[in-house]
Structures are given as C-alpha cells and as structure tokens.
C-alpha cells in the first residue's frame, strides 16, 4: 500500500490533476442529479432542430439574413413545420434554447410557474436607455414598480379619449395635404403616438407631427423636442439588437447609442424637474386641467431617477405598440375593402361622419359597444401581436408541462439559466385554435364565442400582463374611428409580396412602411 501511495504522490501534488478530477466528479454528480430530477418529474426528451451544426454558425447567419429581410417570423414558422412539434430545443453556439408556441407552456412560464422564470439579461440589455423600470426589473423592484404604476391606468385615466383630438387633427392635416396621393401612414402613426404619449406622460407633447406646412401649435424649444423623438427611435433600435444578441448584448455599445441615450435622458430630466419643482397646490391645479402621468407619480415619489426611468419605460410601451397596431390595421383594411366598408357603416351609425360627426359621443364606453370594431382590433392583435416573440430565463431547475416524448405531451426538463423563447405570433396562427384560415384576416371569426385561454395573449399574461392594454385599445379604436369619419376612401399602393416584411425589434411594425392613399 505504501508503495502505491508513493507512486501516485507526485500526481496528487499537481494542482491541475486535482482540479481535473474535481471537475469530472462534479460533472458526473450533476448528470446523476439531473437524471434523478427528470425521472422524478416524468420528463422526456424534446425534439431538436436537426439542421443545426458547426456551432450553429450557418443558422446564426441565416437568422441575421432573414431578420434583415423582415422574414424572421415567417422563417420561424417554417422551422416549426420542419420539426413538426410545438416545442423543440435549438442549440446556439452549443447552448440549448427552448423554443415553444404551446399555450400550456406559455401559461407555465408566465403564470403557474411564474417564480421559476425571470427576465434574465434584459435589465442589462435595456438599462442604458430605460434604467430600472417596470419592463427591466424582476423581483421586489418589479413589484414596487407595478404597484406604483397600476393606479395610473385606472378606467378614469383610460377614458380621457378627447385629449387625442388635437393631435388627430394635426395628423388629418398631413393626410389632406397629400391630396389623395400616396403617403407612408406608418410614419405618421409613429409621430402621432409619440406626440400623444409625451403629452400624457410629461404634460407637454414633442409635436413631431409639426411641419413647415402646418403652422400650429407654436412651441418653445421645438428643435430639442424633435431631437428627443429621433434619439429615442435610434436608441430603441439599438436596444432591439442588444436583446436579440442575448448574452452578447455588450457588443452593441457604440458612441451613437450612448449619445442618443444621453439626449433622451437630458430631455426627460428637464420635465421631471419641472414636476418636482411644483408645490402640492400647483400639482393639484394641474391635475384639474387634465391628467398628466408625471404629476401623479410625483405625488408618490420624489426620486428623479425613479421618475425618469418609469416614464421612459411607459413611453416605450405606449408609443410603439399603438403605432404598430394602427399601421397593420390600415394595411389590412386597405387590402380588404369589404371589411373597411362594413366597419365604416358601424362607425357612421354610431357616431356620424364628416361634418356631422358626433365627436363628443365617442367615449371609452361607446367604443366598447362597437362590436365590429372590436372584432377588427382582436383580429389585428391576433395576426400582428405587438411583441411577437419574448423570452424568459429559468431561475432554478424546473420543467415545462409539455413538449417531451413522441407525442409531445410529456414534461420537459429546463435547467437553471436556460432560455425559453415563446412565440405569440406563431401561437396566434395555429389551426388547432383558429381553423385552416388562421393566416387570413377575418374579423368575423370573433363573432363566435371562443374559449382560447392562453392561445390568445396579445398583451402577455399572468402577473406581468400589460397594465396599459385598455389604454392602447381605446386609443387605437378612437383613432381608427375618427379617421374613417374623415376619410371614406382607402387604397393600398404596395405591390410587394404578401405577407409583408416585418421589422422585429422590441415591438413589431412594417419594415418598409405602409403606403396608402386616403380621401
């Protein structure tokens, strides 16, 4: 025995041998532990996307290519068809990522197993622009943000649709100036929603719809406001790229990105300070003149950083989601004259048209009574959800209820740190729930009472469900109603192939714009 010890003694003193042995032991112990966990939870293997090889480099190149072409979501649909499963695993540079469109798995990630998943590196992705807000935080920080912001989206605040009218009139002037010629209405909608969102949030609009041909309204520091809108757009594009890079987000941190973030922060801090400088009496007086998000938040916190971050988080959500929804709506209405005419008839009957439009009757309550308008909005959010793909990361060893085994009905194992990507876009187009015409724009499908559950989640679900969903729906419905009252002809001027190329960053919109004429 002593001879044996003497013979191995030199190796025991070599640190790399000891460390190697420990690593092998740890690896084996981990494998045994995972196997026991899988057996305990009846987990089965899920399919893998078999075309991945060479460290996923061909796939990564293809993903970058189709994203540039605006075909990322359609490419993902083809992958589902190739794999023939609702849930599968794909390895990106050797790291497994679970991809799912199964409503039961989405329910688990977002609701029933909510505490097993977090945002992962999202905070790091978005922090340079959005800081610590409701969309970037997990845990107690998120809970505090949500409790602070929830009262700001009460029915009383959502119902103030008349505040949209001055901005809508400015939009209408741009359309009339085109005199029936082709316009990119998506560009106008993005300007409209940043104007309405900044007035709602800051108490002062950036008036991005202001134009040399349109003389109103006179504003101070218009150049500063214009640069804010442009900087916010640019910074947001960078954020989208950082999000898709996941753990390699830090690659996107150039001087242009940092400059845009600074301009946005400087602008926002100016209005935050204006709110903080007001006395309680002045804030109350301002509130009597109309609801302003910032002034209500100032009553809850005096921390300028908290105010800035929450305002920018809400601006991100409130501006792009509504603009995208409106753009896709007018795109599909222009493609489907029958639907356009039927919607017009309902609006005319409810609220009049042209010079006889009864604008004061268009309220939160009356819009909800417009059944066909509701069907159109539901169908648009089904086909074009604002956030088509989202991610969560497992905070501990856990499972998803389905996706394993030959039939896909067994639970699957999810290791700690594993990313789960769920595609609302794909779920909303499943024939199992929406029939063989699931890819078609058909508002009438909502005439039937459907128990869709987690197969229809345009505003996410569970504890993190969108606080502003009624606000967005009301704003979009009001704008559609008013534009159809003003313009009774809508034509699409776009000969590009269908489906349209879609830009997918943080939210989704038409990659190349929506070109129509209104008269």
Curated annotation (Swiss-Prot):
Annotated residues for binding of heme: 466
Coiled coil regions in record: none
Compartment(s) where it occurs, according to its Swiss-Prot or TrEMBL record: Membrane
Enzyme Commission number, as recorded: 1.14.14.-
SUPFAM superfamilies: Cytochrome P450
GO-annotated cellular components: membrane
Cofactors (names): heme
Chief location bin: membrane
Keyword set, alphabetical order: Heme, Iron, Membrane, Metal-binding, Monooxygenase, Oxidoreductase
Domain of life: Eukaryota
Keyword DNA-binding: no
The keyword Heme is annotated on this UniProt entry: yes
Induction: By N-alkanes.
PROSITE patterns on file: CYTOCHROME_P450
GO MF terms, alphabetically ordered: heme binding; iron ion binding; oxidoreductase activity, acting on paired donors, with incorporation or reduction of molecular oxygen, reduced flavin or flavoprotein as one donor, and incorporation of one atom of oxygen
Annotated family: Belongs to the cytochrome P450 family.
Function field: Together with an NADPH cytochrome P450 the enzyme system catalyzes the terminal hydroxylation as the first step in the assimilation of alkanes and fatty acids.
Name the UniProt record assigns to this protein: Cytochrome P450 52A13
Annotated organism of origin: Debaryomyces hansenii (Yeast)
């Amino acid at each position: 025995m002593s001879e044996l010890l003497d013979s191995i003694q030199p190796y025991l003193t070599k640190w790399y041998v000891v460390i190697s042995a420990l690593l092998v032991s740890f690896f084996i112990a981990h494998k045994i532990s995972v196997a026991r966990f899988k057996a305990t939870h009846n987990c089965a293997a899920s399919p893998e996307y078999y075309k991945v090889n060479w460290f996923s480099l061909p796939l990564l190149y293809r993903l970058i290519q189709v994203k540039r072409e605006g075909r990322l979501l359609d490419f993902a649909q083809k992958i589902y068809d190739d794999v023939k499963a609702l849930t599968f695993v794909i390895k990106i540079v050797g790291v497994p990522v679970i991809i799912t469109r199964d409503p039961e798995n989405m329910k688990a990630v977002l609701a029933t197993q909510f505490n097993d998943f977090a945002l992962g590196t999202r905070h790091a992705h978005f922090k340079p622009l959005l800081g610590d807000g409701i969309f970037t935080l997990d845990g107690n920080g998120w809970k505090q943000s949500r409790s602070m912001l929830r009262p700001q989206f009460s029915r009383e605040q959502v119902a103030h649709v008349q505040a949209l009218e001055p901005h809508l009139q400015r939009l209408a002037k741009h359309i009339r100036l085109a005199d029936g010629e082709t316009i990119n209405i998506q560009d106008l909608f993005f300007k409209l929603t940043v104007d309405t969102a900044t007035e709602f949030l800051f108490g002062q609009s950036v008036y991005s719809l202001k134009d040399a041909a349109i003389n109103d309204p006179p504003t101070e520091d218009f150049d500063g406001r214009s640069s804010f809108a442009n900087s916010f757009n640019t910074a947001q594009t960078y954020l989208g790229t950082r999000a898709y890079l996941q753990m390699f987000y830090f690659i996107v941190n150039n001087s242009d990105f940092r400059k845009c973030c600074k301009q946005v922060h400087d602008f926002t801090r100016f209005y935050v300070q204006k709110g903080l400088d007001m006395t309680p009496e002045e804030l109350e007086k301002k509130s009597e003149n109309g609801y302003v998000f910032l002034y209500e938040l100032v009553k809850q916190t005096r921390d300028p950083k908290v105010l800035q971050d929450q305002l920018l988080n809400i601006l991100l959500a409130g501006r792009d989601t509504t603009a995208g929804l409106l753009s896709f709506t007018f795109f599909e209405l222009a493609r489907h004259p029958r639907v356009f005419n039927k919607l017009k008839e309902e609006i005319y009957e409810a609220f009049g048209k042209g010079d006889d439009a009864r604008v004061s009757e268009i309220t939160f309550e009356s819009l909800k009574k417009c059944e066909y308008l509701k069907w159109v909005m539901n169908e648009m959010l089904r086909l074009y959800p604002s956030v088509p793909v989202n991610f969560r990361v497992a905070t501990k060893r856990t499972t998803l209820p389905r996706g394993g085994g030959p039939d896909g009905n067994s639970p699957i194992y999810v290791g700690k740190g594993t990313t789960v990507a769920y595609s609302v876009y794909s779920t909303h187009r499943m024939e199992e729930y929406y029939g063989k015409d699931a890819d078609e724009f058909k508002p009438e499908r909502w005439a039937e009472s459907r128990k869709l559950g987690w197969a229809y989640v345009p505003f996410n679900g569970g504890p993190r469900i969108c606080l502003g969903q009624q606000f967005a729906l009301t704003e979009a419905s009001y704008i559609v109603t008013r534009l159809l009252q003003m313009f009774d002809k809508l034509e699409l001027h776009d000969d590009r192939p269908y489906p349209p190329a879609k830009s997918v960053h943080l939210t989704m919109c038409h990659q190349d714009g929506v070109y129509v004429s209104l008269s």
